[in-house]
């Protein structure tokens, strides 16, 4: 009996098909590993969200990053408790006045006598740069950072790029009820920023 002859058409198509299936399988496995890694990191991020700092903890100054309810009021409470000498509110809209900010925080305008408004920052990175300039100008060595729990890690990551190592930063997370989508968004932004910094992209 003569050996079975290979169909040249099938022979030509089988190789590329198997190659495509191999590539698809490899990409699927990579995607699965990345998804599991993201989920594991997200779980860690969620379970270790920072807490508010005790109001009695003293620092030279308090820095409030705008963008969420209760942050400016928290900073004012720190000032009123005598736990900081001065406050920076970073990322204030250019059309917002001191009087309007006082009204929004349900506070008198006089309480803003030791408060500086930062109008230059438009995102977390520029928040950090604005804060670093302010800290250097006043020669502060300790600051209390007020922002949301989900935003805190990314804010501290950006500050670590621009603040001297000698400056101590105390995390003070505003107690708000986070939602799963908001935490997932913050975790993804934090993760992407860490990767960018690791790759040397400022």
Residue spans for each PLM region:
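A structural signal for short, hydrophobic/glycine-enriched beta-strand patches
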Residues: 47-184
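Hydrophobic membrane-insertion alpha-helices, especially the h-region
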Residues: 25-44
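Electropositive, gly/pro-rich neighborhoods at or near active sites that engage anionic ligands
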Residues: 3-5, 15-16, 37, 41-42, ...
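A transmembrane-helix-recognition feature enriched in membrane-embedded lipid enzymes
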Residues: 180-202
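Juxtamembrane amphipathic/hinge helix adjacent to a transmembrane helix
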Residues: 8-11, 170, 192-195
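N-terminal Lys/Arg-rich, disordered targeting/topogenic segments
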Residues: 1-24
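Structural motif marking the loop-to-transmembrane transition
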Residues: 16-28, 177-180, 184
